[in-house]
């Protein structure tokens, strides 16, 4: 499939809608918690078991983004979006078959493994292209697209709940819901495949963008720098703290207020998931755009520092007030989404646009790690507390304390980030070989 090069006069503002059509679709992953209670009931699963498809999906997202990042740079966004469409939709179809036959392993394989590959390739497919179209506003550009991933659950959560109400929450009803998801998202993602274009001067394999200013670092060199691994820690900590709540959102708010005079219904819990998705989406465009004004390091100070404060409030006072619980959770998820949307621009600031898509793909292995850690911490702690006879907010107290600690670790890592040493830079066309050799011989500094 040849790269879709933009014709003369093509408006760059037509590219974000193409990215949104893909990201809004694959963002359904954030609505997985709506399927957890029906699956647990229909297939007799624990909370930890019902999280497996989501966890594996996030693992595969990071791995496929890491190993496929360079290929996406070479083949272009249309090829990547096509692969994402096939894998993501096929994952739902396999899951439908697994639900209909009562074979949970097929749901884990379909949604988690096959669909997870679609998540990873689809997630990174427009990022490098958008940065090349909008070199003047990288935070805003990536925020527009990546907010679709956060907003996907805003659509999918109530839609999935409505389908389960209509089809039923037994094996057959869940299978029909998965089937409709797979077919619908295939059509919607096809819009992105048709619409996406790359700049004429930034074709994959054409040597990068038309104008590349500042340091330019290859993907191979980037992973050898302390800056890459510090950002990896920052992203891992921020994502772990957010994804644990997001994956457990519906049962968590139900448990927190189960013993009150106004317990939370299943419909209200699904609405809470939708609100979190709205905050996730708003944070991606709002905070990433703000980062263009105040800088990436400063915005991550907000994500990590204020995020720890929000978790502390939920831990100490969350069960005393629904508005406080919801408000703190919304702020946390806005930081979570903003962290994702801002990191491509942070990478661009540190490593340039030369292979920023491939570098971004490698960094998303942090998401894979967090996708296991976050749900594992929250679900495992909740399961153990339940076995000990505890209930309500006591199921989550230890998890909240752990999340606070993780955010503090991320805050420290962000403070240690410094500009990349010149010895890692790709020599420009006018750089003498001797100067490039001298740069490589200089000692590393943080």
Positions of the model-derived regions?
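Central cavity-lining transmembrane alpha-helices of secondary-active solute carriers
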Residues: 55-70, 274-286
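Extracytoplasmic gate region of multi-pass secondary transporters
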Residues: 32-37, 157, 220-288, 374-379
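C-terminal ends and interior cores of transmembrane alpha-helices
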Residues: 86-100, 306-319
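C-terminal transmembrane helical hairpin of 12-TM major facilitator-type secondary transporters
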Residues: 235-244, 267-343
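Symmetry-related core transmembrane helices of the 12-TM Major Facilitator Superfamily/SLC fold
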Residues: 175-195, 397-416
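Glycine-rich segments within core transmembrane alpha-helices of 12-TM secondary carriers
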Residues: 137-158, 361-375
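Flexible cytoplasmic inter-helical loops of multi-pass small-molecule transporters
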Residues: 198-216, 423-433
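Intracellular juxtamembrane helix-capping segments at the cytosolic ends
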Residues: 39, 120-134, 141-142, 338-351
């Amino acid at each position: 499939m040849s790269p879709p090069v933009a014709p003369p006069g093509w408006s760059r503002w037509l590219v974000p809608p193409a990215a949104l059509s893909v990201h809004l679709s694959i963002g359904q992953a954030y609505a997985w918690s709506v399927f957890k209670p029906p699956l647990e009931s229909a297939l007799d699963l624990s909370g930890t078991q019902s999280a497996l498809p989501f966890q594996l999906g996030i693992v595969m997202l990071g791995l496929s983004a890491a190993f496929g990042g360079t290929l996406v740079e070479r083949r272009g966004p249309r090829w990547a979006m096509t692969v994402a469409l096939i894998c993501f939709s096929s994952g739902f179809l396999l899951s439908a078959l697994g639900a209909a036959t009562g074979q949970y392993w097929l749901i884990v394989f379909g949604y988690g493994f096959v669909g997870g590959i679609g998540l990873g390739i689809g997630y990174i497919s427009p990022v490098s292209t958008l940065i090349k179209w909008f070199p003047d506003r990288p935070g805003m550009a990536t925020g527009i697209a990546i907010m679709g991933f956060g907003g996907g659950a805003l659509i999918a959560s109530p839609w999935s709940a409505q389908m389960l109400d209509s089809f039923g929450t037994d094996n057959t009803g869940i299978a029909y819901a998965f089937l409709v998801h797979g077919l619908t998202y295939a059509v919607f993602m096809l819009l992105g495949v048709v619409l996406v274009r790359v700049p004429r001067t930034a074709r994959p394999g054409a040597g990068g963008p038309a104008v590349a200013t500042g340091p330019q670092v290859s993907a191979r060199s980037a992973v050898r720098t302390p800056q890459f691994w510090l950002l990896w820690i920052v992203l891992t900590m921020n994502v772990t703290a957010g994804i644990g709540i997001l994956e457990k959102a519906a049962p968590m708010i139900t448990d927190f207020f189960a013993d009150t005079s106004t317990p939370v219904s299943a419909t209200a819990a699904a609405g809470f998931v939708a609100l979190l998705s709205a905050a996730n989406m708003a944070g991606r465009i709002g905070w990433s755009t703000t980062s263009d004004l105040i800088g990436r390091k400063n915005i991550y100070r907000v994500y990590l520092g204020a995020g720890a404060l929000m978790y502390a409030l939920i831990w100490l006072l969350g069960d005393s007030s629904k508005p406080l619980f919801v408000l703190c959770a919304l702020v946390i998820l806005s930081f979570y989404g903003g962290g994702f949307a801002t990191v491509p621009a942070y990478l661009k600031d540190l490593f340039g646009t030369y292979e920023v898509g491939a570098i971004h793909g490698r960094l998303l292995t942090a998401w894979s790690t967090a996708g296991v850690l976050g749900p594992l911490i929250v679900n495992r702690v909740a399961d153990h507390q339940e076995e000990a006879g505890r209930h309500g907010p006591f199921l989550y107290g230890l998890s909240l304390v752990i999340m606070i600690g993780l955010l503090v670790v991320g805050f420290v890592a962000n403070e240690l980030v410094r500009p990349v040493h010149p010895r890692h830079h790709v020599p420009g066309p006018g750089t003498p070989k001797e100067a490039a050799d001298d740069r490589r011989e200089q000692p590393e500094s943080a």
